[in-house]
C-alpha cells in the first residue's frame, strides 16, 4: 500500500456540540419543522448515524432514514421539490448530483467527514495521474470533485462485488479513501488494489484488545463490524457489512446479544429491526474517558432540531447545496455506473434465488 496520508497523525478539529434543548424547546422545533416541511414542499432524509430523535422525525414526517445513496435515491423518486438532508456535506452533494432540479438544504454546511477531508482533490488527482494504468474506484464518502475524477463510485454494500467484477476483467485498482475498507475488499477478492490511506475517525477507534475484553463479559454475544474498522477488528466479527447489511444481520443472527462496532446512531433502526435483542456498543480505543469520537460522528451530531429548523427557514448560502454543472456531470458518470451495476447485481441475485 502506498502511504500518502497518515490518519494516525491527523487531528481533525471537531465541531462544537449543539446546545442542549429543554423538552419544551424540542417540542417547539419539532412542530416548527413539520410546518416548514409542508410550507416548502420539502421532505427530510436522515442518515443512520444521526441522533435517534432526528431519525424518528424523518420517519414521522414521511421522509426516510437510510445510507447516503438511498437518501439521494429516495429524494429522486419523491414528489417534494426540496430535500432537507440530515447528514454530512458529501451526502448533500450526492443528493444534488442525482437531483439537480431540486433544492437541497442541510442543517449546516460545516458538517464534514474525515474520509472526505482526508482525500483532497489536488493530492488525489496527482496520485491517480502517477498510476494511469489503474481504474479509479472511490467510496461514496468523498467530495463531488473526487467523484468526478473517478471511474467508479461505490458504497460498502456492493464494494466486494464491484471489485470482483473489475478484477475479472483484469483491471488493477486505485481505491480511495478508506484504507481499512480497501484492505478488506482486497483480502476478500484478491484483486490488485492500491489504497489511499484515509480513515473514518469513528471506526478507526475500535481496537481488538478492548473488544476481546468485552467478549469475555458477553461470551454468547455476536460481534457486528463495519468494514471501515481496522482489519484486526473485522477478523473478530460474526458479521461484516454496510449499515443496511449490519441491520439485516442483527435480525437474522441467532444470538440475543449483539456487540456493534459502528456509529451508535445505527441503534435506532437496528433496535426497530430486532426489538427482542440487546444491543451493546463496542468499546472505542479510550473506552470512554479518552476516546475522541466515542463511537458517534461529531459532524453527524451537528444535525440537531434547531439547526434543521434554521435550514428550512433560512435556506440561502449557509444551508443550500450547490454543485458546479460541469463537476456534477463528471461525478454523475461514475455514480450512474454504480447504480447500473447495483441494479444488474440485484437482477442476477434474484435470478439465482
UniProtKB/Swiss-Prot annotation:
<feature type="binding site">
    <location>
        <begin position="139"/>
        <end position="141"/>
    </location>
    <ligand>
        <name>iminosuccinate</name>
    </ligand>
</feature>
<keyword id="KW-0808">Transferase</keyword>
<keyword id="KW-0662">Pyridine nucleotide biosynthesis</keyword>
<keyword id="KW-0408">Iron</keyword>
<dbReference type="GO" id="GO:0046872">
    <property type="term" value="F:metal ion binding"/>
</dbReference>
<keyword id="KW-0411">Iron-sulfur</keyword>
<dbReference type="Pfam" id="PF02445">
    <property type="entry name" value="NadA"/>
</dbReference>
<dbReference type="InterPro" id="IPR036094">
    <property type="entry name" value="NadA_sf"/>
</dbReference>
<keyword id="KW-0479">Metal-binding</keyword>
<feature type="binding site">
    <location>
        <position position="68"/>
    </location>
    <ligand>
        <name>iminosuccinate</name>
    </ligand>
</feature>
<feature type="binding site">
    <location>
        <position position="200"/>
    </location>
    <ligand>
        <name>[4Fe-4S] cluster</name>
    </ligand>
</feature>
<protein>
    <recommendedName>
        <fullName>Quinolinate synthase</fullName>
        <ecNumber>2.5.1.72</ecNumber>
    </recommendedName>
</protein>
<feature type="binding site">
    <location>
        <position position="47"/>
    </location>
    <ligand>
        <name>iminosuccinate</name>
    </ligand>
</feature>
<feature type="binding site">
    <location>
        <position position="297"/>
    </location>
    <ligand>
        <name>[4Fe-4S] cluster</name>
    </ligand>
</feature>
<feature type="binding site">
    <location>
        <position position="243"/>
    </location>
    <ligand>
        <name>iminosuccinate</name>
    </ligand>
</feature>
<keyword id="KW-0963">Cytoplasm</keyword>
<comment type="similarity">
    <text>Belongs to the quinolinate synthase family. Type 1 subfamily.</text>
</comment>
<dbReference type="GO" id="GO:0051539">
    <property type="term" value="F:4 iron, 4 sulfur cluster binding"/>
</dbReference>
<feature type="binding site">
    <location>
        <begin position="226"/>
        <end position="228"/>
    </location>
    <ligand>
        <name>iminosuccinate</name>
    </ligand>
</feature>
<dbReference type="GO" id="GO:0005829">
    <property type="term" value="C:cytosol"/>
</dbReference>
<dbReference type="InterPro" id="IPR023513">
    <property type="entry name" value="Quinolinate_synth_A_type1"/>
</dbReference>
<feature type="binding site">
    <location>
        <position position="113"/>
    </location>
    <ligand>
        <name>[4Fe-4S] cluster</name>
    </ligand>
</feature>
<comment type="pathway">
    <text>Cofactor biosynthesis; NAD(+) biosynthesis; quinolinate from iminoaspartate: step 1/1.</text>
</comment>
<dbReference type="GO" id="GO:0008987">
    <property type="term" value="F:quinolinate synthetase A activity"/>
</dbReference>
<keyword id="KW-0004">4Fe-4S</keyword>
<dbReference type="GO" id="GO:0034628">
    <property type="term" value="P:'de novo' NAD biosynthetic process from L-aspartate"/>
</dbReference>
<comment type="function">
    <text>Catalyzes the condensation of iminoaspartate with dihydroxyacetone phosphate to form quinolinate.</text>
</comment>
<feature type="binding site">
    <location>
        <position position="156"/>
    </location>
    <ligand>
        <name>iminosuccinate</name>
    </ligand>
</feature>
<dbReference type="InterPro" id="IPR003473">
    <property type="entry name" value="NadA"/>
</dbReference>
